[in-house]
Amino acid sequence: MKLGVVGLPNVGKSTLFNAITHAGAQAANFPFCTIEPNVGIVAVPDERLDKLAALYSSKKITPATIEFVDIAGLVKGASRGEGLGNKFLSHIREVDAIVHVVRCFADDNVTHVENGVDPVRDISIINLELILADLESVTKRLDRAKSYIKTGDKKYKIESDLLQRIYDCLAEEKPVYSLEFNEEEQKYVNGLFLLTTKPVLYAANIGEEDIGKDESELPLVQKVKEYAQKEGNQVLVICAKVEEEISQLPAEDAQMFLEDLGLTESGLDRLVRTSYKLLGLISYLTAGETETRAWTITEGTKAPQAAGKIHSDFERGFIKADVVEYQTLLECGNYTKAKEAGKVRSEGKEYVMKDGDVVLFKFNV
């Protein structure tokens, strides 16, 4: 699963990405300093792993991960190929969700491509470019579907009607995710690879002087929240500059730095955790002397498909899953005691996995 980190030039996008991945993307004070997308694999914070590893005396801990892609900045007209528009659009098609960094700080030393700080205007610019790109794509498909209706095949009429709904939505400058589809329609829409079907998380990038303030005291943040609420999207408040500084520190120093700022966890941990949920992901856990590990699955995944994440043979020859809830296992003290207490369940092929399930799969191939 990939998240694309987007934003207008000089809003703090690359600075935030540096903090997320330690990848050192060049954060220079001029547009388009991020020419090719930088990719970083980030660990999903999960305190359960350390406790589980201690229980099993595991030699290795492997957390779940999520992939972030730093995508080159864009300006008005990106959908027509201006700026680095075409590159931006091709890269953003490949991600599953969007983290949209929005500037909510004033700094005379950092220019703004639109000559002034206005987060709602910035959001509107990018959203419009995505809508226009989708509109172009849908228009071509709609014209083709309409031309095939005369063949008498009903499927082209159904396709045309659905595309017309999508076209009308985009023509009103609304994203496709604002529409509701039945299961069959959703499959078709997924195959269109439209940009405005992707879930969005707004990262409101504040200045250092605003850290610790109540969000109600930050008018620019409030504007972003009001805009996002209308869309049904989330907002996460973060200071990219400080997060980048924290990311360069040893763990102990980073914790002290956070405490000095009056924070209990870094904004990055919140961002990664929120992004994981945004994608509808959960983790199940496996543990043993060799390794304790978190495995990423989509909510609603059944046991055989979850087993397939470990190895395809596990899914092909699935027999059952021995499952115990993480908290229950911790309370029992170890797996043997949990089993003796009747807390370990044997689940079959229809079992829907839950976040925090500690699992031992049985299979035969």
Residues covered by each model-derived region:
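Conserved G1/Walker A P-loop phosphate-binding module
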Residues: 1-111, 139-140, 144-145
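Short, flexible surface segments
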Residues: 94, 354-355
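Amphipathic alpha-helical transducer elements in NTP-driven molecular machines
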Residues: 32, 46-49, 62-68, 82-96, ...
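Glycine-rich, flexible loop/turn motifs
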Residues: 23-31, 38-40, 48-51, 80, ...
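Short, intrinsically disordered, mixed-charge
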Residues: 22, 54, 90, 128, ...
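Conserved Switch II/interswitch segment of TRAFAC-class P-loop GTPases
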Residues: 40-45, 72-82, 93-156, 169-182, ...
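C-terminal-of-GTPase-core extension/linker across diverse P-loop GTPases
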Residues: 2-6, 17, 144-352, 359, ...
